[in-house]
Amino acid sequence: MKVAKFGGTSMADANSFQRVATLIGENPDARVIAVSAGGTSEEYKEKITDLLIDFKNGESLGISRLKAINEIERRLIELESRLKIRLNILDELLKIGRKLPNDLPSDFLLSRGEYFYAKAFSEFLSLPFVDSKEIIKFKGGVLNYGFTEFLIREKYREVGRFITGGFYGSDENGEIKTFPRGGGDITGAILAKALNAESYENYTDVDGVYPFSPKMIKRYAERTAKIVKPLQKISFDAMLRLCDFSVPVVHSSAVEILKGTGIPIVVKNTFDRFKSGTFVSENCETEDFCFAAESCEKIKTVLKNGRWNRTRAELSIAENSGKTFENALFAYMPNGELTEEILREISRDTPLDFKTETDEGEVVATDKSRAENVKKEIFDMFILLSRRCHKRML
């Protein structure tokens, strides 16, 4: 059996529901499905969770709380109409809307997106809905792994295939507790581990794990789509290193939960089911790759705190803006063989002076007047080097 998790964009609207239903219909081994709250799409520009945050903080932010609740209601009614299903959750939403946000526990309020969308999707698929608060248990503010795994196994034996919401559970008093933002990935990993799944399939809106952050994929979409391909395979260790820099599309805690279990993670695109995605496994030989990170400050922090204490080649190139480093390029090679080549290419093709700090693997552009050119030249260099790395994989 497999566990599948579908993110916010996969749940955004009626078209997305139908697309995911097709994927699940073609994948009978996916026995447990965790879903996120509705995300953005061409039709909807706001995430459901963000609307709930607006409701909670509306008055202080100058936003109408009623407007936020009305928008959530509109989207749920649209699901009802277009999917021809009957939702019994609108009354629950209206009860929330009639209360003052301070009367509602924050975790409870923020978890309602996953709760509503999991119930709606279970109704659409005619599969049992399992409230995550029944199977994901916290104690003393942290996850109670042993009890949680017991409850998940018992529930699976009882109902078989089911739908549940990601991101939340409950504590020993029955109060709703949430994971960090993006915690739906964590829920999926917990389910996969508890059920000793064949694999954990994490569906998102990109073709797999790219060697740079999803934000950069969208920002440089035209160039990256034509040149840089997602990684076909990557080890858990390398994936965790990418997680340090907010590069992958899977939460780092989800990766840590499954590391050492023998359960691989498969990152796939909901919107292109013919793409193979990225296979994250324990003992695979990680391909050579380089990757770009959003912030060099994050690189410095990780290298200093000792988490990345490996005999690896580390190199970063960044614009020094005076306060923060932006558009950093960070290259990671398992065997270090490309380091000299990268340095040579950069010094030859980029008309800047560089300062090398070998203890942190940092190379900083010193000519601040060329900041915009630095951004473009560094990213172009990243594209060039990524293409070379991928050629070596093929």
Per-region residue spans from a language model:
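A broadly conserved detector of short glycine/acidic/proline-rich loop/turn motifs that flank catalytic sites
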Residues: G8, N15, F167-Y168, N269-D272, ...
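Short aromatic/hydrophobic-glycine micro-motifs
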Residues: I85, L127, V247, I263, ...
